[in-house]
Structures are given as structure tokens and as C-alpha cells.
Amino acid sequence: MKPPKSIGFELKTLANLMKRNLEECFSEEDGENGTTGMQGWIIGYVVGNEHREVFQRDLEKDFNIRRATVTGVLKLMERNGLIVREPVAYDARLKKITLTPKARDIHEKNVQRFISFETKLRQGLSDEEVDTFYAIAEKLKKNLEA
């Protein structure tokens, strides 16, 4: 007898598979000099938001992760020469996140990898199925944030 289906179980299984596939994709070329998955996402986020200043609180909110987690990741990125945190003139408490040339080079490589990964995820799915997935994912997020 099969156990009852569970959305949570399916999402956890997908998350594990995605993590494993992404790690394989990124570790193949980078070896020891690579970035973590979260660092790659942050670099991409900062590039995608270059029209405005990006702060730690933006990462906390938009990635839905705790302050301590973001602090640790940003400290490591700073130590590894990927970002610089610069004070802003209008608020001494805030430090904007600026990418270094090293991070920009990594981003260029990552873009192609993410395109390949996204293509792999979408194999066999129609545009309608992808749109349905996004709609369901949005509803699940709202359910969990409530």
C-alpha cells in the first residue's frame, strides 16, 4: 500500500535533487575556487538590482532567510573578495553591497550554468504547465507566510 501523497515530501525531494544537480554543475568547473549556491544567488540578485542600492535587509526579505544566515554568508563573501560593504551617506547604520570584479566574472559563468539548469528543469513541460507551477508555488508561499 502506497503512503498518501504529501506536497511537503515532494517539495523536499525536489529541493534535494535540485541542490545535488546544482552542486554537480557548479563544482565541475570551479573546483576549490567556486562559490556556494547561496553566494551565487546573492551575486545574481545584486546584478539584477543594480538600478538601486542593495542592503543586507533586502537579502533577508527577498530570500526569506534569517539575519544571522545572511551575515555569515556576506562575511565569507567579503573575506573571499566577492563583495565590499560600503556605508551610505544618508544612514550610518546601512552598508550597501557592491560586487567586486571577481564576483562579476563568476556571475558571467553562472548565467550560462543557470540557463542550462533551467532548461533541464523545463524538459517535457509545456508553457502552460510552467505557468501553472508558478501559480501553485506562489499560493504555497502565501500559505506558509500566513
Predicted regions and their residues:
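C-terminal regulatory/oligomerization modules of transcriptional regulators
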Residues: 1-2, 128-146
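N-terminal leader segment of winged-helix/HTH proteins
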Residues: 1-33
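Amphipathic alpha-helical interaction segments
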Residues: 9, 13, 41, 132-135
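Alpha-helical linker/hinge and terminal dimerization helices associated
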Residues: 14, 18, 25, 106-122, ...
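N-terminal helix-turn-helix DNA-binding core of bacterial DNA-binding proteins
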Residues: 23-69
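Charged, amphipathic alpha-helical coiled-coil/dimerization segments
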Residues: 75-135
